[in-house]
Structure formats: structure tokens, C-alpha cells
Amino acid sequence: MRIGGVEVTKFASEMMSSSSSSAVEMLNLKEASNWWSDVNESPIWQDRIFHVLAVLYGIVSLVAVIQLVRIQLRVPEYGWTTQKVFHFLNFVVNGVRAVVFVFRRNVQFMQPEILQHILLDIPSLAFFTTYALLVLFWAEIYYQARAVSTDGLRPSFFTINAVVYVVQIALWLVLWWKPVRVMVILSKMFFAGVSLFAALGFLLYGGRLFLMLQRFPVESKGRRKKLQEVGYVTTICFTCFLIRCIMMCFAAFDEGANLDVLDHPILNFIYYLLVEILPSSLVLFILRKLPPKRGITQYHQIR
């Protein structure tokens, strides 16, 4: 009987310990939830987080323009090359984002409301154009290596970008004329589709170029570096555009995932860090190598 009593006591003790652990976990979850809500609802924390984003974007923009100047000093005899345009667009996109986040609270109260959507969405469109340019560059290299004509690539690049901008402008105009929830959903879903298209572009041409480079001997250090460069950039850009696509789908239908409001600063910080700041920083670092001086090798120039 004493043994039975010990077992009952032990069982009761374990139950109390388990209940106590569950209570502690629930309390921790509640505290975490309260912390998240407190930060989201605090104007001071909202401004701090938005200003941190502004600083980070400013740093990326500064790095891009420094790299642009270095390239210009290295090969001043060339005009606007693909590499120069890529760094210039990075400078512009990140610079505009920095300014928007510095004045994020003012942007939120701009009237008419369509101006808010334009200021928050234009950098995203420019980001798409910037990295679509990288896809174009890789597609040209891939087809040139296979002795296939690349005459149709640049017109396709400009046509795709023109269609994206025209459709987005049309959505803005309709949203201005009739600001209903359905139009906001359509706008976000359209951009989710654009992001998915960009992700697939990186997967298609980055993957093709990577596989093509793999077939060549990789004894040379330069070719091995190029293989790593293409692999890393493809992975980074595919991932960031895929995350953007998924997040836009959530934001379209769930108010809790809305990024165009002041009271979601933590979500804004995580989102923009993952889909723009980190990818841009990593790509700029990976592509930091300066072009060869004139006479060493060919250099791709935008015509």
C-alpha cells in the first residue's frame, strides 16, 4: 500500500509539475504577445523601427553609388554598361526607400490616399526592374555562349517592364477613382504575380547559366568564382522574390499582414529586411568585383 501511495504521490507531483510548466509557457506566450502589441502600437517604437530601416536602406544606397563611381573610374571610356545601370538603379531604389521611411508617418497621412500607395509601391516596381536587368544580362550571356541570337531579348525586357508599369498605373488610377478593398486586393495580387515571374526568371536563366558553367572545366580560379557567383545570386534572388510573392498574397487577404500601415512596424522590418535589404546587400557584395580594364576582355555595354 505504501508503494501504491508513493506512486500516487509521484503521479500527482508529475501532474502538478506539468501543469506548472504549461502555465509558465502560457504566461511566456502572453508576455511575448503583449510585447509584440506594445511595440506595434507605440508611435515611438514605430518611428524607431522605420528610421532603422531608413538607415539600412541609406547604407545600401551609399554602397551602390560608391561601387558605381569605382566602376566609372576603372573604365571611364565606356558609357552606360549593364553593370553601371544595375548599380545606379540600386542606388535610386534604396535611396527612395530610405527617404520614404524617414518620412513614413507623413506618408501615411498624405491625401489623396492614392499617393500613399504610389510612394510605397514605386520602389518595389523599380526593384523588380533592377533585378530583371540582371536576368537579362544572364540571358544574353547564356544565348551568346550557345551561338543563339539575342536580338529579341532587350525588346522583350523593355516590353515586359512597360506592361508591368502600365498595368500598375491603371490599377492606381482605378483605385483613385474608386477606392474599394477589391482594387487593393487586385493591386497586391498583381504584384505577387510580378514577383513570382521574377523568381521564375532567376530560376530559369540563372539555373541555365549555372548548369552551362558546370559543364566547362573549373580548374581556373576565375571560372570557379563565376560559377559560385551565379549560384549564390540565383539562390538569393529567387528566394527573395518568392518570399515577396507569398507575403503579398497574405497581405492582400489578411489585414494582420498589411504592410501599408503604421501599426505593423515589426512586420515591416522583417519583410523589407528579407526581401530587399539583405538580398541587395549580398548581391552587391558578391558582384563587387570591378570590370577588367580596357583591352583585357570584352565588356557588356547597354546599347
Curated annotation (Swiss-Prot):
Membrane topology of this protein: Multi-pass membrane protein
Effect of a null allele: When associated with TOM1 disruption, reduced efficiency of intracellular multiplication of tobamoviruses (e.g. crucifer strain TMV-Cg), characterized by a reduced accumulation of viral coat protein (CP) and reduced amplification of TMV-related RNAs.
Disulphide bonds in the chain: none
Side of membrane Cytoplasmic, spans: 70-82, 139-156, 205-232, 287-303
Keywords: Host-virus interaction, Membrane, Transmembrane, Transmembrane helix, Vacuole
Extracellular compartment residues: 1-48, 104-117, 178-183, 254-265
Subcellular location: Vacuole membrane
Chain segments annotated as transmembrane: 49-69, 83-103, 118-138, 157-177, 184-204, 233-253, 266-286
GO BP terms: viral replication complex formation and maintenance
UniProt family annotation: Belongs to the plant tobamovirus multiplication TOM1 protein family.
Protein name as catalogued: Tobamovirus multiplication protein 3
Organism: Arabidopsis thaliana (Mouse-ear cress)
Phylogenetic placement of the source organism: Eukaryota, Viridiplantae, Streptophyta, Embryophyta, Tracheophyta
